[in-house]
Amino acid sequence: MGPGLLCWELLYLLGAGPVEAGVTQSPTHLIKTRGQQVTLRCSPISGHSSVSWYQQAPGQGPQFIFEYANELRRSEGNFPNRFSGRQFHDYCSEMNVSALELGDSALYLCARSL
């Protein structure tokens, strides 16, 4: 069995339901293989128009990916174009990562603000 068959991508999401942070993320855990695509969802509690996405790799602090406000991308960090997203009229947001790489294994967080 070659080493490529044993290489799995593990993507974690924090928050299985509404909490004080004011967001619901889904799915909460996800296992994908290299080269696949993934869609992560974030639903903020109503009244919060801005959603930010972060990646936290093992042993590191969170890194800013991008922020959406009122359905428009307001700012973005230094991530490749494989990371894309959008925000809907109800302020829910999706982040897509295409062509997964080993370095994408991380905890992914979304945060809301007014």
Swiss-Prot record:
Residues 1-21 form the signal peptide. The keyword Endoplasmic reticulum does not apply. Disulfide bonds join 42-110. InterPro entries: Ig-like_dom, Ig-like_dom_sf, Ig-like_fold, Ig_V-set, TCR_beta_variable. Keywords: Adaptive immunity, Cell membrane, Disulfide bond, Glycoprotein, Immunity, Immunoglobulin domain, Membrane, Receptor, Signal, T cell receptor. It is found in: Cell membrane. Its main location: membrane. Glycans are attached at residue 96. It holds the Pfam family V-set. GO terms for cellular component: plasma membrane; T cell receptor complex. One of its GO terms (biological process) is adaptive immune response. Residues 22-114 form the Ig-like domain. Alpha-beta TR is a heterodimer composed of an alpha and beta chain; disulfide-linked. The alpha-beta TR is associated with the transmembrane signaling CD3 coreceptor proteins to form the TR-CD3 (TcR or TCR). The assembly of alpha-beta TR heterodimers with CD3 occurs in the endoplasmic reticulum where a single alpha-beta TR heterodimer associates with one CD3D-CD3E heterodimer, one CD3G-CD3E heterodimer and one CD247 homodimer forming a stable octameric structure. CD3D-CD3E and CD3G-CD3E heterodimers preferentially associate with TR alpha and TR beta chains, respectively. Probable non-functional open reading frame (ORF) of V region of the variable domain of T cell receptor (TR) beta chain. Non-functional ORF generally cannot participate in the synthesis of a productive T cell receptor (TR) chain due to altered V-(D)-J or switch recombination and/or splicing site (at mRNA level) and/or conserved amino acid change (protein level). Alpha-beta T cell receptors are antigen specific receptors which are essential to the immune response and are present on the cell surface of T lymphocytes. PANTHER family: T CELL RECEPTOR BETA VARIABLE 5-5-RELATED (PTHR23268:SF6), T-CELL RECEPTOR BETA CHAIN (PTHR23268). This is Probable non-functional T cell receptor beta variable 5-3. It comes from Homo sapiens.
